[in-house]
């Protein structure tokens, strides 16, 4: 009996060790699931933001900003700014393998509204690839590759940064021809991310790396310096219209 009792105690001790060794294994599995969920959530947060690029593959297509503003479970919301239009969209986002796949639709009350289908790789959330199809036959379908880029106002970019950084004098503009004056004035708007409705204005700025279409209304974003400079430039544009070739250099 003296031998048996210590033997029983030893066996019970071994069983207790084996039971304890199994518990951490279950806890580890649970923590992996939690970490995976957190990783997915972080990936969702990483894809929120603006993606910018050419909307189409024809060589003369407009630059687009696609803004993902909200993700709630599998619901996604945002808006696009392109060709002078600012349109909302909403839809679904699902994880498939290494990608987030999005199907989203614009409201449908504009003749150029349509449906987006695009994907973002979980390991490269700086790039978005997809296509868009119009609801009506008012325009052609588009394919696109967009890159994450945050809009930031910078008064110092462009050919005529002085129009945003200091008050202009008459000597700054009196010898400029109308095309130069027009460019100087519209460059102020471009710095604020204004999405031009006129095709010729879009062509001037959309190939510039610093230009990011961000809004169709910039009235509340212009600085006091810029407002005064715009008024001065407009006056000289009117002079150029009146005097034609005799005006400017």
Descriptions of predicted regions:
Residues 2-9:
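Sec-dependent signal peptide recognition
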Residues 14-16:
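C-terminal motif of bacterial Sec signal peptides marking the signal peptidase cleavage site
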Residues 18-20:
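Bacterial signal peptide processing site
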Residues 32-124, 138-145:
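Central antiparallel beta-sheet cores of small beta-barrel/beta-sandwich binding domains
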Residues 131-138:
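Short, exposed beta-strand-loop hairpins at the edges of beta-sheets
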Residues 138-162, 167:
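Pro/Ala/Gly-rich low-complexity, hydrophilic intrinsically disordered segments
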Residues 172-214:
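Amphipathic alpha-helical packing elements
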Residues 196, 203-249:
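Compact alpha-helical subdomains of small soluble proteins
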């Amino acid at each position: 009996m003296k031998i048996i009792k210590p033997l029983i105690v030893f066996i019970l001790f071994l069983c207790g060790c084996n039971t304890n060794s199994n518990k951490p294994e279950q806890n580890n599995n649970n923590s992996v699931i939690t970490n995976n969920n957190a990783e997915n959530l972080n990936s969702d947060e990483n894809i929120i933001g603006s993606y910018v690029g050419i909307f189409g593959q024809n060589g003369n297509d407009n630059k687009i900003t696609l803004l993902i503003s909200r993700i709630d479970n599998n619901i996604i919301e945002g808006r696009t700014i392109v060709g002078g239009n600012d349109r909302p969209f909403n839809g679904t986002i699902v994880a498939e393998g290494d990608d987030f796949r999005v199907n989203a639709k614009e409201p449908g009350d504009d003749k150029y509204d349509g449906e987006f289908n695009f994907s973002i790789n979980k390991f490269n959330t700086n790039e978005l690839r997809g296509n868009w199809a119009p609801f009506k036959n008012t325009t052609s379908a588009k394919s696109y590759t967009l890159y994450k880029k945050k809009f930031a106002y910078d008064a110092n970019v462009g050919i005529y940064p002085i129009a945003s950084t200091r008050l202009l004098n008459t000597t700054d503009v009196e010898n400029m021809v109308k095309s130069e004056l027009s460019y100087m004035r519209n460059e102020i708007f471009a710095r604020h991310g204004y999405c031009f409705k006129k095709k010729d204005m879009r062509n001037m700025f959309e190939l510039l790396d610093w230009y990011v279409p961000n809004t169709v209304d910039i009235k509340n974003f212009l600085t006091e310096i810029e407002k005064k400079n715009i008024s001065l430039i407009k006056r000289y544009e009117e002079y150029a219209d009146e005097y034609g070739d005799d005006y400017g250099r």
